[in-house]
């Protein structure tokens, strides 16, 4: 059996990006660990009690069969033009020493004997500064710890842009969100793993519902979350029943359906292109 560590920026990210994959791994008998960099105090556009958000994370993780939850100790950096001062006794993640943060994560990877680290793509999905930092710290920690194999949690850029068009029409996002989505995530051709998690849709939806601060708060994201957690499970599974990853330095003829299966190296110069 394998040990898989999922490194995320904030509480609720573990559901949105890897919830079904974590539930599937746990059901198959593997050990799963969730590590969050930040406490969630600036999550989803609302000020929130960090301890409440971390408690919600633990409840979510339990619904996904996660064996252990760890907070690295950093505060949220927020998403937007303003970077707030550090709160008392904490450092905002984007201001953290990357080497120190990577050292903390590497120590945990060694302690767990991790076989795989789930991290983030280089764009930080839609450009969130904490998500970009997760990518940098995750890559460095994996190298320090072994190295440990890495998969970057992401989504096909083309699919994200397509889905956000009707969501924007419903008033749930604004223009700059759509622009960020079109420039973020990962091009479809670079996706190496596509995981079918439709059998775990009920668990994933229940885990999202555990994040009550995010679901019942204010703002566009909360309205969207409330809509999603109330969907019939088959419809939720249709929308959120696949999760995507990119393996750095690898390329596949078609996406692999198991995160524990490694992709082959990308073709070098003069070796042709991969047909998808």
Q: For the regions a protein language model found, what residue spans apply to each?
A:
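Active-site rim/loop-helix segments in enzyme catalytic domains that contact anionic ligands
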Residues: 1-113, 140, 246-255, 273-276
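Metal-dependent de-N-acetylase/amidase catalytic core
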Residues: 2-3, 85, 91, 95-276
